[in-house]
């Protein structure tokens, strides 16, 4: 019996058989300006010759799965002959869903997986639980860890003790990658070029040039300097999708510091945007979101737990999700948490080698466990007991 592991994120789906490798595939559909009538699904994005003005159709809104028609089409594509050629008669699935997911969404998920696709057994689980499983497998002497999952829609901070989540201490910050990209679009549109329709391009700009500042005010001073002294400034060459397929940063020695470029390329000059955008993860109040930043929320979450457990959480802080890939992210989280923590506690912040696929790898490990059969709901169970058995078994 094969097991398919699907970390069904709001932006990317991480999918693969438990005995094989993982693929990271957009969990959405696209329409392009040039081919208006055709809808592209998942990794058909690569077929679009001119992705400028790309229009996204997402199954998730504000972190929850609400558009089932789109999700079905993406799954049909992923499970179908183009991709994974799933033989449902002989396949189990491990699938992730958000924390505190609405029961109506959970019921729809059961119906679609069991009744439409007819998987043999299903395990629905939070992505953080898979990450925690992976972490405990790598660190068998540890009993506790706190998972910081900073994804597309939200950032969740979730303490796990012996693989059970501590619901009373979960914190959600309403800042994720989508908000950062949108904020960068607004800043660039206000200061330089109108890019409000260019989500795809600006998302790439964000990933290529943004970083987390270790000293915000010092970097702000550097960003004000003129010419050579301004080490923060970069010139980003935007793609035109004929000769330049993907944007890139001009090498420092080729930058024209005063005057215009002769090459005819379209250039974005970025200075304080590079670190002011990721700063929102640490100070959401900068843009009027009255919430704690990530380091404060980690400390607040741990302080909601019994005192004798707290030191174990401080020394097992695990970062997952796409936003943790900003250069400097781990160091900043460490230094701020260290400042807020009693001196006699050790603080350790772990950034896995691939924080995007970390929870998928946890799912792969769970599928190889001896007790895997006790965790899943089989089709026979579901046909006999319906949604109730899923509610009992799955701790969402």
Swiss-Prot record:
GO MF annotations, alphabetized: nucleosome binding
Keywords, comma-separated and alphabetical: Activator, Cytoplasm, Cytoskeleton, Nucleus, Repressor, Transcription, Transcription regulation
GO biological process: negative regulation of transcription by RNA polymerase I; nucleolus organization; positive regulation of transcription by RNA polymerase I
Keyword Transmembrane assigned: no
SMART domains for the chain: ACTIN
Entry annotated with the keyword NADP: no
Cellular component GO terms held in the UniProt record: cytoplasm; cytoskeleton; nucleolus; nucleus; Swr1 complex
Localisation: Cytoplasm, Cytoskeleton; Nucleus; Nucleus, Nucleolus
Predominant localisation class: cytoplasm
Coiled coil: none
Family matches, as InterPro entries: Actin, ATPase_NBD
Domain of life: Eukaryota
Subunit structure: Interacts with CBX1 and CBX3.
Biological role: Required for formation and/or maintenance of the proper nucleolar structure and function. Plays a dual role in the regulation of ribosomal DNA (rDNA) transcription. In the presence of high glucose, it maintains active rDNA transcription through H2A.Z deposition and under glucose starvation, is required for the repression of rDNA transcription, and this function may be independent of H2A.Z.
Family: Belongs to the actin family. ARP6 subfamily.
The name this protein goes by in its record: Actin-related protein 6
The species this protein was found in: Gallus gallus
Name of the gene encoding the protein in the UniProt record: ACTR6
């Amino acid at each position: 019996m094969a097991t398919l592991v699907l970390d069904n994120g709001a932006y990317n789906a991480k999918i693969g058989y438990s005995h094989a490798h993982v693929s990271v595939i957009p969990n959405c559909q696209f329409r392009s300006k040039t081919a208006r009538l055709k809808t592209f699904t998942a990794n058909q994005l690569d077929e679009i010759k001119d992705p400028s003005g790309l229009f996204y159709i997402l199954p998730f809104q504000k972190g929850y799965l609400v558009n089932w028609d789109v999700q079905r089409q993406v799954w049909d594509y992923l499970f179908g002959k183009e991709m994974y050629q799933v033989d449902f008669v002989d396949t189990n699935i491990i699938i992730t869903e958000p924390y505190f997911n609405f029961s109506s969404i959970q019921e729809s998920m059961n119906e679609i997986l069991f009744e439409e696709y007819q998987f043999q057994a299903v395990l629905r689980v939070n992505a953080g639980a898979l990450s925690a499983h992976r972490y405990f497998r790598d660190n068998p002497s540890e009993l506790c860890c706190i998972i910081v999952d900073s994804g597309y829609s939200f950032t969740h901070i979730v303490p796990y003790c012996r693989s059970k989540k501590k619901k009373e201490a979960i914190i959600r910050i309403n800042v994720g990658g989508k908000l950062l990209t949108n904020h960068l679009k607004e800043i660039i549109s206000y200061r330089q070029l109108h890019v409000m329709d260019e989500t795809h391009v600006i998302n790439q700009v964000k990933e290529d040039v943004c970083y987390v500042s270790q000293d915000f005010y010092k970097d702000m001073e550097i960003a004000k300097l003129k010419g050579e002294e301004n080490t923060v400034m970069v010139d980003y060459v935007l793609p035109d999708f004929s000769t330049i397929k993907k944007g890139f940063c001009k090498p420092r020695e080729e930058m024209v510091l005063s005057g215009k470029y002769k090459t005819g390329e379209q250039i974005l000059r970025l200075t304080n945007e590079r670190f002011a955008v990721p700063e929102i993860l640490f100070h959401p109040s900068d843009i009027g979101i009255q919430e704690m930043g990530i380091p404060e929320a980690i400390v607040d979450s741990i302080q909601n737990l019994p005192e004798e457990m707290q030191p174990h959480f401080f020394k097992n802080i695990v970062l997952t999700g796409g936003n943790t890939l900003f250069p400097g992210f781990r160091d900043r989280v460490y230094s701020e948490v260290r400042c807020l923590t009693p001196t006699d506690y050790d603080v350790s912040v772990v950034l896995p080698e691939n924080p995007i696929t970390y929870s998928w790898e946890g799912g792969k490990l769970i599928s190889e466990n001896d007790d895997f059969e006790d965790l899943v709901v089989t089709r026979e169970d579901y046909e006999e007991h319906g949604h109730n058995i899923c509610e009992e078994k799955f701790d969402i």
